[in-house]
Amino acid sequence: MTDKIRTLQGRVVSDKMEKSIVVAIERMVKHPVYGKFIKRTTKLHVHDENNECGIGDKVEIRECRPLSKTKSWTLVRVVEKAVL
């Protein structure tokens, strides 16, 4: 049995915490009745060991063991820095 680690990409929406960030993951979902595709957002708390992310950065994250009550994802890399 192979266990593939889940990885996702998203945008940083908050970096106010120490060693933690909040990442918004956007996905498209089809409406069950009308068939229109709707944009849905999920916010995940992510562990950022070196505090290297800022708001607006595009990041890659992966699932890990639970680090706190709400944090079970860790930062893999910063894909694209935000233009300020």
Curated annotation (Swiss-Prot):
One example of the protein's molecular function in GO is:
rRNA binding
Give the source's domain of life in one word.
Answer: Bacteria
- Which Gene Ontology BP terms does the record give? translation
For the keyword Transmembrane helix, the answer is: no
Look up the record and report any one GO term of the cellular component aspect: cytosolic small ribosomal subunit
Record's keyword annotation contains Ribonucleoprotein: yes
Record's keyword terms, sorted: Ribonucleoprotein, Ribosomal protein, RNA-binding, rRNA-binding
> So what does this one do?
One of the primary rRNA binding proteins, it binds specifically to the 5'-end of 16S ribosomal RNA.
Q: Which family does it belong to?
A: Belongs to the universal ribosomal protein uS17 family.
Question: Which PANTHER family would you find in this protein's record?
Answer: 40S RIBOSOMAL PROTEIN S11 FAMILY MEMBER, SMALL RIBOSOMAL SUBUNIT PROTEIN US17M
Could you describe the subunit structure of this protein? Part of the 30S ribosomal subunit.
> How is this protein named in the record?
Small ribosomal subunit protein uS17
Species source reads Klebsiella pneumoniae subsp. pneumoniae (strain ATCC 700721 / MGH 78578)
Gene that specifies this protein: rpsQ
